Amino acid sequence: MAILATTNQSKKSIEIIPAGSYAARCYSMIEIGTIKETFNGESKERKKVRITWELPTEMITFNEERGEQPRVIAKEFTLSLHEKSTLRGFLESWRGKSFTDKEAQSFDVTNLIGVPCMLSITHKTATNGNTYANISSVSMLPKGMDCPELINERQELTYDNFKQELFESLPDFIKEKVVMSKEYQSLNKDTNEVPF
């Protein structure tokens, strides 16, 4: 009898979101926390946030029991509003205006949950040959264009008000990042247990 190792073929293949422009609505902000990243051989600690949007005009059935649901797409950012930060430029484009110096000192990104926008999605092929949908840009919705109301339940995970139930409902790859953060480790310093 053989024990065969295969690629994970039990996972249902879902077609990637076609490239194009979409009305979208933010429904999730996950504070990943401060994690170590290595880029070009240099390691740095960065505080990260994951922002997720639903595309309410792009419905798909992921699970027969739940029926049609909107497709979703996410982007991870370093949580910084420095004038050269990616997040700042992205949010200014979404809001349609620049941050004032006062706003940039302390802006609660969770205020954008439920706010509609226009997302441009492009495709990129990774070195492993897989093609992924990526958010290339954001803008305010064009004048006169509507975006349906939020369909997914609002998700907000912060260390100020850590919701264990929400954390446990996240995909494993996100939880793995969260548990590596300084903030999570500080929150759970009395236990060495991996929560999933």
Residue ranges and their predicted role:
Residues 1-196:
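Short beta-rich binding modules
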